[in-house]
Amino acid sequence: MVTDVGEVDDKSFNQSAWEGVKGFAQQAGTFAVPTSADYIETQDAKDYATNIGLFAESGCDGIVTEGFALGEATLAAAAKYPDVKFIGVDQWQAEAVPNVAGLIFPEDQAGFLAGALAASMSKTGIIAAVLGTDLVPPVVAFGEGYVNGAKHVDPDIKVIKT
């Protein structure tokens, strides 16, 4: 797996993806499919393509790239290494690419449910959401869903987002 910029144990997107990759490797091993997992922590966005290439050149059959920011580098690597399978987490491809599977999650729906729950539990009519940066589309979608879910339960609720 190639992480987005940051560490694999970031308690966020990189870590969630890595835990999924490790889980897959363990499960595949129970079916007598020899599978191993490793990661490269990306230190700078300019290194996405290089890091993906390191795994592709080492003979990996499949590479997971974590985050929407790796989308272009993933597609470029897929074209350069057609025998390697790629999974792009939070990546959407406008055109189908045979060796790329993009995983998109409905963050707005998860946010809606969280906001609805928070509003239904509020005793003051005020709830809050602590979100990450507004530069990350999935975080924005979750936040919008949160507000919509809260307002669905209580149209007058005050929602504080940070």
Regions found by a protein language model. Give the residues of each.
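A residue-level marker of the well-folded mature domains of exported/periplasmic proteins
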Residues: 1-162
